[in-house]
Amino acid sequence: MAYPFQLGFQDATSPIMEELLHFHDHTLMIVFLISSLVLYIISSMLTTKLTHTSTMDAQEVETIWTILPAIILILIALPSLRILYMMDEINNPSLTVKTMGHQWYWSYEYTDYEDLTFDSYMIPTSDLKPGELRLLEVDNRVVLPMEMTIRMLISSEDVLHSWAVPSLGLKTDAIPGRLNQTTLVASRPGLYYGQCSEICGSNHSFMPIVLELVPLKYFEEWSASML
């Protein structure tokens, strides 16, 4: 979960988020090395008294500063494309959940069940119980089984929304008239919070998302109680 004054990412709860964290560290290291080299060159230019006014061309240098950036871009692009294809790959999901964005709440439908639908509204601050999180708690949580492939179908009834859960590495636009899909696989149980990540009106900040990931046995008990 997130912590006050946190600067980094939330702990990864899915294989995709773990890959994204590794890619972030990989890219950040490349950026750090390039920035260090640029600062070193600038400081050397400011402190040295040597000049090369007679130099008209330098084929070796031009070759290096053409090939080296290309290699660096390839080192960034290859792992990025790998993760992109992983995020779009959906193989035999065990469960499908349809998510619809509204101004300003979410509705969910478990399409594998005959009549398992509900709306999810934010709990007002005045109604919170001790220990509950302000602006993040909802009246109906999305209960899902852990360690299973879940397909999320996401759309909107009115304006643009975005369904995002940072610790799972999920952020999918909810667009009216279009059905987007994403895959969710949680590696451990727990409560995972997200919010609408697309400005959608005056109450945009009051559209939280709460996923409750539980073992399959407890999910079956919950789904039976909801029918």
From Swiss-Prot:
Stretches in topological domain Mitochondrial matrix: 46-59
GO biological processes: ATP synthesis coupled electron transport
Residues annotated as binding Mg(2+): E198
Segments crossing the lipid bilayer: 15-45, 60-87
Residues binding Cu cation A2: C196, E198, C200, H204
Primary subcellular site in the record, as a coarse category: mitochondrion
Topology versus the membrane: Multi-pass membrane protein
Cofactor section: Cu cation
Domain of life the protein comes from: Eukaryota
Record's function text: Component of the cytochrome c oxidase, the last enzyme in the mitochondrial electron transport chain which drives oxidative phosphorylation. The respiratory chain contains 3 multisubunit complexes succinate dehydrogenase (complex II, CII), ubiquinol-cytochrome c oxidoreductase (cytochrome b-c1 complex, complex III, CIII) and cytochrome c oxidase (complex IV, CIV), that cooperate to transfer electrons derived from NADH and succinate to molecular oxygen, creating an electrochemical gradient over the inner membrane that drives transmembrane transport and the ATP synthase.
Family statement drawn from the similarity comment of this UniProt entry: Belongs to the cytochrome c oxidase subunit 2 family.
Name of the protein: Cytochrome c oxidase subunit 2
Organism, scientific name: Equus asinus (Donkey)
Lineage: Eukaryota, Metazoa, Chordata, Craniata, Vertebrata
